[in-house]
Structure formats: C-alpha cells, structure tokens
Amino acid sequence: TGLPDIMMPVASLADLEKISPDFPALSKLSEKYQVVGVHAFTTDCDDATCHVRNFAPLYDIDEEAATGTSNGALTYYGYLNGFIKAGDDCRFVQGEKMNRPSLILSHIEASGEENGETENGEAENNKASCSIQVGGSAVILAEGDIKL
C-alpha cells in the first residue's frame, strides 16, 4: 500500500486487548526498520476476519482507530499466509480499545495462484497478480475553517 508496517500476529483477542506499548521504544523500532508502525492482529474471533490494533507513535499516533492502508496490507499478508483466500470479502474490526470502533472492509482478487513444492519438499507459494480494494463508512469527527 506504500506505507510499510510490521504485521504482528497475536494469539488471542484477550492478548490483543492487553497490549500496552512502550511508545518511545516502538518509535525507535519504527525508525530503525523504516516503518510507520506496528499492526497487531488476531484471527481469534467469530465476528470478523481479524480484530486489529495499529500503533504509529513515530508519527505522533499512539493508536489509530481505523487504518485502511494497514488493513489492505494485512489482506495481502493473510492471503500469503493462507488465512485469507482469493475472492474473500474481509472485515477488520479496529479502534475498540479507544472506544472508537471501526469496521474496515477489503476484497482481494488474484490471478495466477500456484502452490507447489520446492525440490527440497518445502511448500512454495507463487502468488502472482493481486488486486485489493479497501473501504468502509466514515463519520465527521470535527469541522472547522482555517484562515491563512
């Protein structure tokens, strides 16, 4: 999506909710690896593809309520790792811990998917071309005029 994040799988929804980042350390990590931040997620849920939390303190965003670019990237990550399939309509729940629950939607289409084995018998994923769409509803949180 053009904005790199560290994708961080978490075992359970309870573990995701317990995350309490060390924001200065996370800023240093983000700077070191030249990423926007960390996109923590779990597939341990029945109401969505994933529940997620996004942290980007390097950019003065301790936690983000809705992150389309990161969930678009998570869609592809899930596709590469087998928990999202071509043609899936995905639902990502984010912002709950901030009392600003958001639902981000994505859809993935792919062509040229071939799975096989290498000469060593290891799994090989040759995922060719993908198209990912991301969207959702929005609400106005603030309005105003800026005079220059």
Predicted features, each with a name:
Residues 1-148:
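Active-site proximal loop and beta-alpha junction motif in alpha/beta enzyme cores
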